[in-house]
């Protein structure tokens, strides 16, 4: 039996989370899985997909609106398949040091993980360019600009997901 493709869907405002989704997709492909990486707002159906990884940037304590909308729109279908969630956003190294439950602004993400019976919910550091525009990004960039993503940690998380899918796809 052929495994249905894995969908990696994401909500990203400035491109950092989109790049993380691609890293996750690459790690899954390296484990011989078929993967599609798409912006969450462009996904119209989960038909033809198996496991789903859904990620979104965290802004001011909220998960990206496209990730939230995706989770609401496909909630019942997501509860019927393996699902993993991730958030990106702390603009420091706290995501590498603390459990998601101890990170500020992750409550909504964790509630969604519970509602969808996600197998895991990870939080990774984010990225904010010094020249970010708009409020509150421009104000935050003055003191917290930088790339706090940890590609090795993200790829290791994806590698663990691949092992779970290859061992027990349902």
Role assignments for model-derived ranges:
Residues 42-47:
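Short amphipathic alpha-helix with an adjacent loop that forms part of the alpha/beta core around
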Residues 6-10:
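Short, hydrophobic/glycine-enriched beta-strand segments
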Residues 11-15:
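Short polar catalytic/cofactor-binding loops
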């Amino acid at each position: 039996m052929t495994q249905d493709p894995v969908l990696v869907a994401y909500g990203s405002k400035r491109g950092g989370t989109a790049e993380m989704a691609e890293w996750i997709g690459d790690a899954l492909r390296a484990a011989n899985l078929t993967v599609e990486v798409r912006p969450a707002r462009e996904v119209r159906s989960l038909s033809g997909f198996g496991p789903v990884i859904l990620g979104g940037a965290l802004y001011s304590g909220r998960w990206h609106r496209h990730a939230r909308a995706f989770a609401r729109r496909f909630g019942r279908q997501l509860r019927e398949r393996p699902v993993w969630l991730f958030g990106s956003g702390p603009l420091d190294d706290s995501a590498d040091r603390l459990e998601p439950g101890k990170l500020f602004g992750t409550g909504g993400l964790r509630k969604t993980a519970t509602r969808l019976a996600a197998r895991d919910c990870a939080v990774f550091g984010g990225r904010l360019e010094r020249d970010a525009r708009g409020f509150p990004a421009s104000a935050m960039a003055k003191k917290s600009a930088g790339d706090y993503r940890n590609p090795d940690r993200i790829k290791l998380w994806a590698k663990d997901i691949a092992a779970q899918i290859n061992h027990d796809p349902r």
